[in-house]
């Protein structure tokens, strides 16, 4: 369960399914243009009391075997269209910046520089949107995959968002802190959970 509280008032209580459904609905309704999430430059719009900006941590290229291990590569290539590059797919890591009153909330932080030179652009993108990383007051993780939270730390190991509090759904937290989780993961994904 995710509660977004801004200026001390609960505005939105969501589970992951409801959050993703709302996001998909906004795209389908044209509130967020389909191509906005693929833009490298910040894209801003207003929704109720929120000023929302789509920022970027960069682009991420993943093999089809990671994107959808059970799908046929030719089906994925057809589905992904221009995002497909041979047997790989390119995605934009697009965290959302929400502002309301004194709250500056970042939904996800991207992958940081851990996925190569095309990632790790979140501080630069925030600055292009008129916000310094140090101004972020809350970071909310939609889920704890590396491409959503590894952008929290810089190359120096320090927080990119030194003045923020950090939030994740309780069920998500409990999953990732499960004892011996690495032994339950596929071999090629054990590195996601080993410390």
What residue ranges belong to the model's regions?
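Short, solvent-exposed loop/turn and secondary-structure capping segments
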Residues: 65, 151-152, 178-179
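N-terminal export leaders
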Residues: 15-23
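N-terminal secretory signal peptides
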Residues: 1-14, 28-29
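N-terminal signal peptide c-region/cleavage motif recognized by signal peptidases
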Residues: 33-35
């Amino acid at each position: 369960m995710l509660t977004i509280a801004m200026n001390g008032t609960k505005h939105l209580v969501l589970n992951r399914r409801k959050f993703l459904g709302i996001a998909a609905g906004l795209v389908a309704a044209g509130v967020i243009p389909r191509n906005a999430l693929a833009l490298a430059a910040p894209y801003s719009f207003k929704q109720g009391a929120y000023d929302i900006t789509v920022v970027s941590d960069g682009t991420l290229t993943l093999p089809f075997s990671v994107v959808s291990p059970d799908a046929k590569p030719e089906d994925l290539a057809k589905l992904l269209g221009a995002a497909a590059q041979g047997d790989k797919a390119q995605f934009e890591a697009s965290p959302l910046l929400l502002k309301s009153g004194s709250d500056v909330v970042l939904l996800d932080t991207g992958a940081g520089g851990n996925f190569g030179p095309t990632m790790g652009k979140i501080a630069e993108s925030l600055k292009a949107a008129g916000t310094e990383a140090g101004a972020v007051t809350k970071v909310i993780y939609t889920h704890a995959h590396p491409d959503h939270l590894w952008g929290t730390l810089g190359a120096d190991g320090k927080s990119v968002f030194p003045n923020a509090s950090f939030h994740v759904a309780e069920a998500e937290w409990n999953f990732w802190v499960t004892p011996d989780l690495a032994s339950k993961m596929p071999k090629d994904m054990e590195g996601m959970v080993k410390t």
